[in-house]
């Protein structure tokens, strides 16, 4: 994977991917660290559409909120990350939890990039029912959760 960032003007930059796509980073409107967090949350959110779809299931009303606490002084790295998953589906609660864990433990590249240096917790509300609240991810190494190949945005 390769991305090239070029200065446009003032504090605006253009990011281009090796696949030819581009977007503008407009600091300080949205900071690079906010883009990073948004990318992390988008990665796991896309998994929560792709994994169920592969199993013939449908997810609706999906929302994932990422809340980070960072160092107050440089380097202002992530210390803690909490992910709050809320969605409805035509599957049972066990399947819904497996989808979340599949994303967290295996498929989401961005979560797995920060997991060794960041305390990560998560909550899951499925079909209006709170299934997990502030559960800590303790493995630190990912796990062999295999739903096969999925077509999610972080697969490339």
Predicted regions and their residues:
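Extended beta-strand/beta-hairpin segments
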Residues: 1-38, 49-156
